[in-house]
UniProtKB/Swiss-Prot annotation:
Protein name: Glycerol-3-phosphate dehydrogenase [NAD(P)+]
Substrates-to-products reaction catalysed: sn-glycerol 3-phosphate + NAD(+) = dihydroxyacetone phosphate + NADH + H(+); sn-glycerol 3-phosphate + NADP(+) = dihydroxyacetone phosphate + NADPH + H(+)
NCBIfam families per record: PRK00094.1-2, PRK00094.1-3, PRK00094.1-4
Lineage, top ranks: Bacteria, Bacillati, Bacillota, Bacilli, Lactobacillales
Pathway the protein contributes to: Membrane lipid metabolism; glycerophospholipid metabolism
Main location: cytoplasm
EC number: 1.1.1.94
Domain of life: Bacteria
InterPro entries associated with the record: 6-PGluconate_DH-like_C_sf, 6PGD_dom2, G3P_DH_NAD-dep, G3P_DH_NAD-dep_C, G3P_DH_NAD-dep_N, NAD(P)-bd_dom_sf
UniProt keyword list: Cytoplasm, Lipid biosynthesis, Lipid metabolism, NAD, NADP, Nucleotide-binding, Oxidoreductase, Phospholipid biosynthesis, Phospholipid metabolism
Residues the record lists as binding NADPH: S11, W12, R32, K109, A144, R259, V283, E285
Pfam families per record: NAD_Gly3P_dh_C, NAD_Gly3P_dh_N
């Protein structure tokens, strides 16, 4: 049994914490929200995120980060991208001088605005190497709702040090949650972040009344864009046909459980972005990631026409139907381009 600290009590963080408790580990789940902490501890409920799910009574929540991470062998961060640096900064102070250093894992899917950095890069900058044994990315097709009811799920643990990836594989794996290892952190993180862009587009197509052919085309050509950008930064092309690539893309771009798909659907129905964000009440990572990926592609001269079209819809108020027409009216080219 290991002590594991889980930082972030949203849908995914709380369900992963619950899984680890059921795997026999001592888990402390950290949240800033004391009311949420009290409800998790007293009623074993997290209604804002998983209203119908009852958590294992062995799961302990706290608003005290020091209590959560003290003595933890593994620290799992499941924080929205925009909050990663702040939480990592707090964590760095708490880990200063701690031995043995814990293994860090993150399950956040996004790119930092303005710097365009991946989450592992932010963590490496904020938390000194002496305060951590490694940084592992946990990613793949894994809706929290499915894991909560113990549907069969498979994900990837990616780390340049495969021994660290294998440690996380053993920590999380059970009869319904299977973890594979990979050493391609860049590919895993780009796949995890960029699929949210395509999920927005897929939802928008459904909202506009398009059917299976259109969604299949979007997902396939969207994967080509994800691969192009990832490879430009050193990712292994094979990663994008794995769980953290096409696997995560398919589940996020086809399921109504995906908040990015739902947000795109509302946009396709004619709602304004500000209203969609307010209605959702949760972070829609794909909106910010679209901007970051578009700007990154411009800087690296990577062709990402679907991403560019979504950028214009989200940030320049272009009509969605016009954006789709524009994509279809581009000069025809080879599928390999």
């Amino acid at each position: 049994m290991k002590k594991v600290a889980v930082l972030g009590a949203g849908s995914w963080g709380s369900v992963l914490a619950n899984l680890l408790v059921e795997n026999g580990h001592q888990v402390m789940l950290w949240s800033r929200n004391q009311a949420q902490v009290d409800q998790l501890n007293q009623e074993h409920k997290n209604p804002h995120y998983m209203k119908d799910f009852t958590y294992n009574e062995g799961l302990v929540a706290t608003s005290d980060m020091q209590a959560a991470v003290s003595g933890a062998a593994v620290i799992l961060m499941v924080i929205p991208t925009k909050g990663v640096r702040q939480v990592a900064g707090q964590l760095a102070e708490l880990l200063n001088g701690v031995t043995p250093a814990p293994l860090l894992v993150h399950a956040t899917k996004g790119l930092e605005q303005n710097t365009y950095k991946r989450v592992s890069e932010m963590l490496a900058e904020e938390i000194p190497a002496a305060s951590r044994r490694g940084i592992v990315v946990l990613s793949g097709p894994s809706h929290a709702e499915d894991v909560a009811i113990k549907d069969v799920t498979a994900v990837t643990a990616a780390c340049g040090d495969l021994a660290c990836a294998k440690e996380i594989q053993e920590l999380f794996s059970n009869h319904y949650f299977r973890v594979y290892t990979n050493d391609d952190v860049i590919g895993a993180e780009f796949g995890a972040a960029l699929k949210n862009i395509i999920a927005l587009g897929s939802g928008a197509l459904s909202g506009l009344g398009y059917h299976d052919n259109a969604r299949a085309a979007l997902i396939t050509r969207g994967l080509a864009e994800i691969r192009r950008l990832g490879v430009a930064f050193g990712a292994d092309p094979m990663t994008f046909i794995g769980l953290s690539g096409v696997g995560d893309l398919v589940v996020t771009a086809t399921s109504k459980n995906s908040r990015n798909w739902r947000a795109g659907y509302q946009l396709g129905q004619g709602q304004k972005l500000a209203d969609v964000v307010e209605n959702m009440g949760m972070v829609i990572e794909g909106v910010a990631t679209t901007k970051a990926a578009y700007e990154l592609a411009q800087k690296r001269h990577v062709q990402m026409p679907i991403t560019a079209a979504l950028y214009r819809v989200l940030y320049e108020d272009e009509d969605i139907k016009s954006a789709i027409d524009g994509l279809m009216e581009r000069e025809v080219t080879s599928e390999k381009e």
